[in-house]
Amino acid sequence: MFSIYYSYINCVSILLSEIFFAMKRIFSILLLISFSATSLATYSFESYFKEERVLVAKYLQANKSKMEQKASKYHHDQEFVTAIIYPELLRYNYIQDFIETSGLEILYMRCGAKTADFSIGHFQMKPSFAENIEKYIEKNAEDFYHYKKLIIKHKATPVVQRKLRLARLKQMDWQLTYLHAYIAICDHKFHFLKFTTTKDKLRFYAACYNIGFHKKYQNILQNEKLNTFPNGPKYLGTQFCYASIACAYYVNPKSMQ
């Protein structure tokens, strides 16, 4: 009798506990939505990333020579190149204290990008991004002679290829090469587009970098205007438009310091 009674009380206690935490979660979500509406109305990305902007300015100054050399090598405008990844530099400094990728790296090496795909380094490049660039260059080898070193030899096993790719993405020099290859790919893939201004071109290339150049043209156009940065489309808090931040930097880089 007492055993049954005790079990009943225990079950009720657990049920009430679950209800309490469920209500707590619902309340938190409602509070977040309410706060988000206010935040979106009062925050600019300049104030939201105030501390990150200072760190990014120092990073760009420290690596100015390296970035200019790469831009000169591949005949790209340095400010245009930097603007594309400027939002990612902000994001990197925003989340770096929470980054732990060792487990994901092992999972990626063993199973591939479909199982584990995550952002790496200051430019926040994912393994799948590098893979797509390598595949595009290999498919159009005649037009991408200057980027042929990005192609990983097929003799290497898939695990070794992934390990090498991860090692590359942890180095700034390689990330810069992938970045310039990305711009060259956009020039090649979207050659039919006629941009009125360089800013319009940047807006498209930045949106494309944000969601992936392999996505459909209409999806990229849509992303030019969406406030899904820095936490993705499912996040309910303060968000900004990736392409707009890139353009703001390009128009007046000194104001971002």
Set out the residue ranges of the language-model regions.
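Catalytic glycan-binding domains that act on GlcNAc-containing polysaccharides
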Residues: 43-257
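Sec-dependent N-terminal signal peptides
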Residues: 26-35
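Bacterial Sec-dependent signal peptides at the C-terminal "C-region" and cleavage site
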Residues: 34-45
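Leucine-biased recognition of intrinsically disordered, low-complexity hydrophobic segments
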Residues: 15-16
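Aromatic (phenylalanine/tyrosine) cluster motif
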Residues: 2-8, 20-21, 27
